[in-house]
Regions:
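Condensing-enzyme catalytic core mediating Claisen C-C bond formation in acyl metabolism
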Residues: 1-24, 219-284, 288, 295, ...
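Active-site-proximal alpha-helical scaffold in enzymes
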Residues: 85-116, 153-183, 249-256, 343-364, ...
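Conserved catalytic cysteine-centered active-site region
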Residues: 24, 55-109, 140-147, 216-242, ...
Length: 386
């Protein structure tokens, strides 16, 4: 049995819809992350046993096994196997879990968990457009994302002002993190076509090395935004995650094999979880996933130094906080998807990457990463810095 550890983790910058990364095909985005994590670790890519890639909208340019074709696009060894998975927004976090599982099982001594979403080119939901009809006997009350976010706000008694305050917090923390250089180590800059008038074509290229989604906002500006779902709703564009392009990759190895190769293990995966949540609330799964992953590690909220709770909507994080009552100074310390963006198939691996680098920067010991996912699912991971 292997002892899985994280040896390296990288991510691309995150681009806005139609923005800096819109001219890159998903194979190029993900292939860049895959190749970068291998090259930065300094391992022979032929020693990677398997690749697990998360992607949500698996159609169009993201159809036909994007994880495998990204690997080949990057010029990496053809003999390495790959699996592309759909666990909705939890896809690449679950990809890292699967990479760790096969290392633990002794199937491989090295594996990559990664993910991509090129939402400018493959819009969310385009794989079921025009709307795929539900069965005539469908009786499950599972709302869309915005309706779910509003239901969660109702459930916890969260008001518009609280949500706006959290949206402002995300922007301010992310801006400060960039100013302090906190993301520099995890980012792998990418050469991308400069978008043309059609937003996905260009003849010039530019090196993209920074997240595009940050906004200089204020309480007044957020308060002036109209709710997405009309009068009476609470969530606005300022308290929801952004439509984005990006990729991330995490290299998992057996600890003994890594040390024998002269590589430095950087974190252990103490526990992982994938849970189903109550469909009526759809996106409230991080509450249950956190409880399960803590139980699996034999830990409590007080044992965790850093939390990364994906900011799909402000109410998702605040609902989670209402139940688990963490020290909020430990939660999303460098901002989250409201400010940085949410390339859905890549975000899980991005959160693990950011958590690893922040553990090292701050000298902290443990991190818990969790996120909601479509289909009333949620993933969670606990890392321990080595």
């Amino acid at each position: 049995m292997g002892n899985p550890v994280i040896v390296e983790a990288v991510r691309t910058p995150i681009g806005r819809r139609g923005g800096w990364l819109a001219g890159l095909k998903p194979q190029a985005l993900l292939g860049h992350a895959q190749r970068s994590v291998v090259m930065r670790a300094g391992i022979d890519p032929s020693t990677v046993g398997q690749v697990f890639a998360g992607c949500v909208t698996q159609s169009g340019e993201q159809g036909g096994h994007v994880g495998r074709y990204a690997w080949l696009y990057a010029g990496l060894p053809a003999q390495t196997g790959a699996t592309t998975i759909d666990c909705q927004c939890g896809s690449s976090q679950q990809a890292v879990h699967l990479a760790a599982a096969i290392v633990h099982a002794g199937v491989a001594t090295a594996a990559i968990g990664c993910g991509v979403e090129a939402m400018s080119r493959c819009p969310l939901g385009s794989n079921v457009l025009p709307a795929t009809p539900r069965p005539a006997d469908w009786s499950i009350d599972i709302p869309d994302q915005f309706a779910a976010a509003e239901r969660i706000a109702d459930r916890r008694g969260l008001g518009r002002e609280q949500l706006d305050e959290f949206g402002l917090r995300s922007q301010q923390l992310a801006a400060q993190a960039w100013a302090d250089g906190r993301f520099d180590r995890e980012i792998v800059p990418v050469q991308a076509p400069v978008p043309g008038d059609d937003a996905v074509a260009g003849t010039r290229t530019a090196l993209v090395s920074r997240d595009q989604g940050l906004r200089d906002t204020s309480r007044g500006a957020l308060a002036a935004l109209k709710p997405v779902r009309g009068e009476g709703a609470r969530h606005t564009a300022g308290t929801a995650s952004q439509v984005s392009d990006g990729a991330a990759a995490v290299l998992v190895m057996d600890e003994q094999a890594a040390r024998a190769s002269g590589l430095r293990p950087r974190a252990r995966i103490l526990a992982q979880a994938l849970v189903g949540a109550e469909p009526y609330y759809h996106l409230d799964g991080p509450v249950q996933a956190t409880a399960k992953v803590l139980a699996g590690a034999g830990m409590t909220v007080g044992d965790i130094d850093l939390f990364e709770v994906n900011e799909a909507f402000a109410s998702v994080v605040l609902s989670w906080a209402c139940v688990h009552k963490p020290d909020m100074a430990k939660v999303n310390v460098n901002g989250g998807a409201i400010a940085l963006g949410h390339p859905v198939g890549a975000t899980g691996a991005r959160l693990i990457t950011s958590a690893l680098h922040e553990l090292e920067r701050s000298g902290s010991a443990t991190a818990l990463i969790t996120m909601c996912a479509g289909g009333a699912l949620s993933t969670a991971t606990i890392l321990e810095r080595i």
